[in-house]
């Protein structure tokens, strides 16, 4: 009996100690909350960190863009047009590594813009996909341009002549259909075999992609043109 009474007393003491510790934690939490409320009511300024510039980073940043075999010759022919905006405006260093087939981009001491390296990489990548230099250089000037790539078979599984006819419907006679979609949606489109690349703003890419998907499925071009004009007019009214 005495042992049972002693164990009960020990349990009571332990429970009392645990309650005390919990009450201390709650009171500490309340005091912290009160201090935070006082700071917010008193108008205490929050700590603000200055914006990091490229000069603050000690290490040089490097980006490499792989160039496909079929774009090496156009790259050599248009190297001056690619080289000038990257070096002159973005203040980056650029070189072509012929062994690895990669364009190497590197920041320098004169680089001021933090997003310069990413913009240059996107510009070179757009050219490697097949876009003209005059179209791809818009990535350096505008911030809201993107590239959306997809396969024809992602829309509809086609093989052989059916696949060729679907690509032909997207291109049109002498590229007329593709040019019409580009002009109406203010985008640029590259047909690289089964792969399709679209350069433009998010909303315009969506309209152009819907039109291309309709053509792949088998919709007549006249119907696609009418739908394009109505959708593009709505976008123009909205913005």
From Swiss-Prot:
Residues 30-44 have a biased composition (Basic and acidic residues). The keyword Protein biosynthesis does not apply. Its main location: nucleus. Residues 160-212 form the KH domain. It comes from the Eukaryota. SUPFAM superfamilies: Eukaryotic type KH-domain (KH-domain type I) (SSF54791). Residues 21-45 are annotated as: Disordered. Belongs to the PNO1 family. This is RNA-binding protein pno1.
């Amino acid at each position: 009996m005495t042992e049972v009474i002693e164990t009960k007393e020990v349990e009571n003491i332990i429970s009392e100690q645990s309650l005390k510790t919990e009450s201390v934690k709650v009171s500490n939490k309340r005091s912290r909350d009160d201090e935070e409320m006082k700071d917010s009511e008193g108008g205490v300024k929050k700590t603000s960190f200055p914006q990091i510039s490229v000069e603050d980073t000690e290490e040089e940043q490097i980006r490499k863009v792989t160039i496909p075999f079929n774009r090496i010759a156009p790259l050599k022919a248009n190297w001056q047009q690619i080289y000038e905006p990257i070096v002159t405006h973005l203040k980056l260093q650029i070189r072509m590594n012929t062994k690895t087939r990669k364009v190497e981009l590197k920041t320098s001491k004169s680089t001021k813009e933090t997003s310069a390296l990413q913009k240059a990489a996107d510009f070179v990548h757009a050219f490697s996909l097949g876009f003209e230099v005059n179209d791809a250089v818009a990535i350096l000037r505008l911030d809201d341009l993107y590239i959306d790539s997809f396969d024809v078979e992602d829309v509809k599984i086609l093989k052989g002549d059916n696949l060729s006819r679907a690509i032909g419907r997207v291109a049109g006679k002498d590229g007329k259909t593709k040019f019409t979609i580009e002009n109406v949606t203010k985008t640029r489109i590259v047909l690289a075999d089964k792969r399709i690349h679209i350069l433009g703003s998010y909303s315009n890419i969506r309209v152009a992609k819907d039109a291309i998907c309709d053509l792949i499925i088998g919709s007549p071009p006249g119907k696609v043109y009418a739908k394009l004009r109505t959708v593009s007019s709505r976008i123009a009214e909205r913005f």
